[in-house]
Amino acid sequence: MKNLIALTLLLGGSTLLCAQKPAKTPATYKPVKSEMYRKGWIDFNKNGVKDVYEDPSAPLEARIENLLQQMTLDEKTCQMVTLYGYKRVLKDDLPTPEWKELLWKDGIGAIDEHLNGFQQWGLPPSDNAYVWPASRHAWALNEVQRFFVEDTRLGIPVDFTNEGIRGVESYRATNFPTQLGLGHTWNRELIRQVGLITGREARMLGYTNVYAPILDVGRDQRWGRYEEVYGESPYLVAELGIEMVRGLQHNHQVAATGKHFAAYSNNKGAREGMARVDPQMSPREVENIHIYPFKRVIREAGMLGVMSSYNDYDGIPVQGSYYWLTTRLRGEMGFRGYVVSDSDAVEYLYTKHGTAKDMKEAVRQSVEAGLNVRCTFRSPDSFVLPLRELVKEGGLSEEVINDRVRDILRVKFLIGLFDAPYQTDLAGADREVEKEENEAIALQASRESIVLLKNAGELLPLDINSTKKIAVCGPNANEEGYALTHYGPLAVEVTTVLEGIQEKTKGKAEVLYTKGCDLVDAHWPESEIIDYPLTDDEQAEIDKAVENARQADVAIVVLGGGQRTCGENKSRTSLDLPGRQLQLLQAIQATGKPVVLILINGRPLSINWADKFVPAILEAWYPGSKGGTALADILFGDYNPGGKLTVTFPKTVGQIPFNFPCKPSSQIDGGKNPGPTGNMSRINGALYPFGYGLSYTTFEYSDLDITPRIITPNESATVRLKVTNTGKRAGDEVVQLYIRDVLSSITTYEKNLAGFQRIHLEPDEAQELSFTIDRKHLELLDADMKWVVEPGDFVLMAGASSEDIRLNGTLTVEDYQTRAKAIEAQKPAKRVSTSTNPEDAENVLDEKINTAWQGNKGDYITFALKNGAKVDKVAIAFTRDNNLPATFEIQLSGGGGQFLTVYSGTVSEYGKLISYPFKGTTASDLRIVLNDDRVSIAEVKF
């Protein structure tokens, strides 16, 4: 199929290619109409004058207002909709004369996934002539952009949006592991590089907005979109989301649009129902788990886009909620970008949720709530026309429209569309997309995402010199589809696990392969509840795999899931291996040969039998196009696996919800004795807990130190520890820091992730690590749903997983009153102390001008303030026998002996109390420092 597509591309798959495009793509794109394109600016409205919005040096908000004032209602409403790209809604790959008669003659907000190669779910990539190579693709998007710049009245450029959670979704681009796999790297810098590459390749291809990252937090392992989350911990999701956005938006190369806001990933029973309705969470859990990543990524990374979600929360659809899209998102979080709906989410207000009577009412509710841009699988007319009617009928204020359009224009200005609307470096696109350096980072991401779950008897790594015959089987052994799904690159070359092993062992070992079974059987998913017997064909295929295993030194069985079992609208009722996979594994294990199980899947699986009877297990998730190479490197010891779980593996689906973080004792039942006379009624504990992962080497943790051990709510503490590689191989360790609030006014989590670092250590090498603990780690939502830091003890735990804690210590948080009393108690009995002439110190407080304390340059007098007083001025009476000018400083201290200068000046007048004001703050001590000799202070008043 790939060869056929490639041939079509070479010959040209469109008549427009022959009619409008030169035979060879130029190295640089230059628009045809030169009179619009002035030196240093573009005359978008073609009036011959540099308007404010056309002036790159003008202030951002001034440019927005100038353009908005020139826009008609038709032009404004066209900015509030997405046009789905080629072969979805848009039937043309390049502009046609008909476009001047269609809705977007007045412009369009965004064009989504145009010419990215995706057609529909289950179909092969498009064979259109403009999907590849990169230079031709960029040229085609430029031509579309040129229509909006040159052939619309105001020339407002379009925002080309696209998916990008594992590399930009294009016919070809650098292909990374799925986002769940990327989460398992625990590597902030790597995630930033993934974002940087994805954003850079997107812009070189002509896209300006990437729908990434996914900021949903995984809570139910049955959920179909579990493959798209970073993990279960809101802290980890936030930390990696921040890095992804910083990479994507580097130098404003593209806008990053995080999704799905809000409370999206925990719908009832993991059933999607197309609207993802009725999420099962308390208000406090929504805040602690699901809102937390969005809040931090918006505030700390400046994310420019947010996608609103399909679901309701407590009966209120998010898509129509002013509370979620305006009060919380813009008001509380300070979001300044634009909100785009998930596809058809507006329609769902009346087709699914039943909170609007028709499309017009759904449009009104959405726009009033805070929606800027409607994304849809349908014609943009279906949104824009009722929107215009609402304004004309008085059902919606045009000022509301203005507010929504301001946000859209702000993003377009920020990403440079009004200064450089075209991707002019066409030759650069061919050099940049899938370049060697990017591919190397993709391979490293694949390696770092893989988790070693079991390695009994140190079966792994395999000795390539003594392993002469290897049996490989399983439905995922020679499968590449997991790397070519929607939301990422579609037609790249994939190295399968089989190919990776064959390449690694070439000339050294014989590889015997048979599939063994399909991913699912003919009765699946019903076969999860009814035990259908094996067919003759199924038994014969398993028998072939068994015969290969008997001949081999080791059997590598590659099982898991794929597009049939995981993905959007692919939630499950079981977490067991689907189809005949377990029967295949059991048959291979029964041969008595060493077995290595490799899992390639998009969610945790309950592999209890494998954990008990198979000696070595690797979890690879969907490891990207380089997955086969990465797994071969790990199997044969060229890379030491260091990934750690960001999700919990339940032993059975009956334990769900079963995740991290959790409330104390909420995931374990009473009873310890099994059997007919016991008191145990259900399975307890995780198969593999959050943070778990093995290595080919060992690590020792030591020397935990917390400094300071006592802080106030707005102060921070530093946690230090040492980690040493005590094994014989170099390797990575993900060092995890957890925190527990010992006593609080509400029930808090048993432990919460508070920090992590992935480090690489050679044998016998040690490294000191440090973590900062501050307010964001300590605060809780109190009974009044207010974020507060309550005084008390917090246990800090460093370990190799959430259940493998190696070191712990206690941090104490004091309230301000306790701290003030402690400082007061530590003060000397004397209220005044001096650097010299202490016998005269009290003279400055006796209210007599003729008695004084005298000092020389560098001398000082210090006053202890009562109960941490807030001071913003002090009155001082200076005297000097020669009346020459003298300078001095006023300093404040919050305790601990450190003073900061808050005032420097010259004595205004001698022999008189003069007030000297400064910026006030709470302080425990005030000091007056002399900068000249023989200066006296007669009186001081506060």
Question: Could you tell me what each predicted segment is?
Answer:
Residues 715-719, 859-861, 870-872:
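Structural beta-strand segments of beta-rich domains
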Residues 1-23:
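Bacterial Sec-dependent N-terminal signal peptides
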